[in-house]
């Protein structure tokens, strides 16, 4: 996928014309592949293999840094299952940061952990991920910022939502894996 939908909702048309049948819609951040351009329109194919035409001004190139994309959500409240500025959970934050960059990754922390490549602590770099949990599965995930700091969505006493902070001492013993997507 080489571009993203850059507007809240973009109509996908059967032909490159505003009056053509609307076949589906793209949502902001949705990645698409451009197959052809014609007079201000782009023939696209979605990540779900759906073809159609979208106005070129409703698309933008894929670029950026997942940390910067995640920072868009700083201050958003924690919401289990959430994926918007109105509320977002830890794995939703990671999912949406990558989605804004045109990468569709799994939604939940345990699935994200399974999709990542293991990293040794000595090789940990900004943007890598730390998973946390007890027993056999990851239940929390955070971006590593470096210098002992993480970026995540959390809900605990005194903290609610997306924050950048020094890795809390109560989380450190729950570390499961260090991964890179």
Show the residue positions of the predicted features:
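Boundary regions of SH3-family modules and the immediately adjacent low-complexity/disordered segments
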Residues: 1, 17, 30-33, 38-40, ...
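Aromatic- and glycine-rich peptidoglycan recognition patches
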Residues: 1-4, 68, 83, 145-181
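Short, basic/aromatic beta-hairpin or loop at an interaction surface
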Residues: 1-13, 96-111, 145
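Beta-loop motif signature
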Residues: 5-34, 78
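Short beta-strand segments
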Residues: 24, 50-52, 140
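Active-site nucleophilic cysteine motif
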Residues: 70, 84-101
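Second-shell loop/turn segments in exported
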Residues: 77-84
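...with weaker cross-activation on analogous glycine-rich loops/strands in unrelated enzymes
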Residues: 103-165
């Amino acid at each position: 996928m080489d571009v993203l939908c850059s507007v809240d909702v973009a109509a996908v048309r059967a032909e490159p014309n505003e009056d053509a049948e609307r076949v589906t819609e793209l949502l902001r951040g949705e990645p698409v592949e451009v197959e052809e351009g014609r007079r201000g329109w782009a023939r696209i194919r979605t990540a779900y293999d759906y073809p159609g035409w979208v106005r070129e001004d409703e698309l933008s190139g894929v670029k950026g840094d997942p940390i910067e994309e995640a920072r868009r959500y700083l201050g958003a409240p924690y919401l289990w299952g959430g994926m918007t500025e109105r509320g977002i959970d830890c794995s939703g934050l990671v999912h949406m940061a990558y989605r804004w960059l045109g990468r569709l990754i799994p939604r939940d922390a345990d699935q994200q952990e399974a999709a990542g490549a293991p990293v040794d602590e000595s090789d940990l770099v900004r943007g890598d991920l730390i998973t946390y949990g007890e027993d056999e599965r990851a239940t929390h995930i955070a971006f590593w910022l470096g210098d002992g700091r993480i970026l995540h969505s959390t809900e605990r006493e005194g903290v609610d939502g997306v924050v950048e902070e020094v890795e809390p001492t109560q989380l450190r013993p729950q570390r499961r894996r260090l991964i890179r997507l």
